[in-house]
């Protein structure tokens, strides 16, 4: 089963639709439902950063992150941080879309090479969906 949840960063500016579910609540959810694949909108409210902790990487094995809110929340440099963390394979574009026009994203995605862009735009989603049909957790 696959579920998309909206998450929000616990700090920073307020915006329409910003909720109160942050990284801590999202991590607890992943821990409680390890068999469920979860896409966290808004880059998981920063949850992905905790995947750099070995114990959290295990807990967050079922977590994926959507990039649709990236232009509202972060500088383009965040894509370099995601790459440095080795987590490109867990990021999706379009599961929480449309938020802005596609041109805004195209400028941001210039920070990615062709392989990374293809992963975010399609391959990661296909791999995730294929894992559901294969019964992987």
Where do the model's predicted regions map?
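Catalytic pocket-lining loop regions of alpha/beta-barrel enzymes
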Residues: 1-92
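Short, flexible micro-motifs
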Residues: 47, 97-98
């Amino acid at each position: 089963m696959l579920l998309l949840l909206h998450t929000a960063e616990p700090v920073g500016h307020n915006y329409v639709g910003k909720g109160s579910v942050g990284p801590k609540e999202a991590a607890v959810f992943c821990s409680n439902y390890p068999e469920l694949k979860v896409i966290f909108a808004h880059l998981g409210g920063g949850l992905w950063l905790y995947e750099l902790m070995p114990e959290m990487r295990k807990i967050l094995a079922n977590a994926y992150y959507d990039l649709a809110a990236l232009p509202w929340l972060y500088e383009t440099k965040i894509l370099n941080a995601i790459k440095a963390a080795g987590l490109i394979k867990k990021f999706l574009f379009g599961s929480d879309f449309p938020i802005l026009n596609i041109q805004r994203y195209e400028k941001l995605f210039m920070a990615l090479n062709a392989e990374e862009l293809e992963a975010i735009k399609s391959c990661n989603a296909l791999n995730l969906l294929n894992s559901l049909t294969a019964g992987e957790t």
